[in-house]
Amino acid sequence: LNVRGNLLIGELAEKLDFPFKRNGSLVLCLDEKDYPNLQKLYEKGITNGVKKLRILNHDEVLEMEPNVSENVYAALYAPTGGIVCPFNMTIAFAENACVNGVEFRFDTEVLNISRISSGTENWKIETTSGTYETKCIINAAGVYADRFHNMVSEKKIHIIPRKGEYCLLDKSAGSHVSHTVFALPGKFGKGVLVTPTVHGNLLIGPTAQDIENKEGTNTTRDGLDQV
C-alpha cells in the first residue's frame, strides 16, 4: 500500500491542490558493523517493489548532503520519497469527500456499538447526536480504537499511547538538508529524522515515549533535549 500510495500521491496533490514535493530520502548507516542491516533494508524495499533504490558510499552521501556526519559509512537512497503538509492534505481529502457525498458529524461522541440483524444492516451505533444503523464500521479512532473494539469483541485490548515530540525550526534553517534523512530503524521504529518541510522549515524528531494520557500532547524539556 505504501508503494501504491507513493505512485498516486503526485496526481492527488495536483487534483486536490495540496503541497507535495518528491525530495527523496536517505537512511544513514554510521558504522560499518551496521551495514548488513542497511543491506537488509535495501532488499526488503526491492521485494516490496520500491523503484530506483540504491546504496550510496561515504563520498556519495556527503556529495548529496554535505551537512550530515563525516562519520557516515553508507546510506540507502530512495529517490521516490516525498514530503507533504499532513494538515493541508487531510483537509483536502475531507473537502473532496464532502463534495462526493460524505456527511460529517462533528462534536458527536459514540456511546455504544452493538450487533443487530435488521434487514441489510449489521451494526447499531448510539451517539450523542442520534442512533445510526449501518452495514459496516471502520474503526479509525487512533488511540481510542481500543474503546470501540472492546464494545463489540470478547478479546479486550488496551492501547498504550506513544507520544512523539518534534522540533520545528525556522525557515532560515530549511536548507540544511534537501532530503528526508533517517537513521537506521531500530526495534521501536524509525527513530529521529531530519527533513525539510513543504513550507521551507526544518523538522527534527520525533521522540518516542509511552504515556497513559491519550490526550497528552504537551511538549517537555527532556523531549527537546533528546531531539
Which residue ranges define each predicted feature?
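Dinucleotide-binding Rossmann-like beta1-alpha1 core, especially the glycine-rich loop
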Residues: 1-64, 191-192
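Short beta-strand to alpha-helix junction loop
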Residues: 3, 28-37, 76-95, 105, ...
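Active-site substrate-recognition segment that forms the wall
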Residues: 7, 16-20, 131-132, 141-227
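A structural signal for short hydrophobic beta-strand segments in well-ordered beta-sheet cores
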Residues: 28, 110-116, 194-196
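A short, glycine/Asx- and small/polar-enriched loop/turn
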Residues: 33-36, 64-72, 114-124, 174
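General beta-strand structural signal in soluble alpha/beta enzymes
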Residues: 54-57, 104-106, 139, 204
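Helical element adjacent to the flavin cofactor pocket in flavoenzyme catalytic cores
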Residues: 76-136, 144
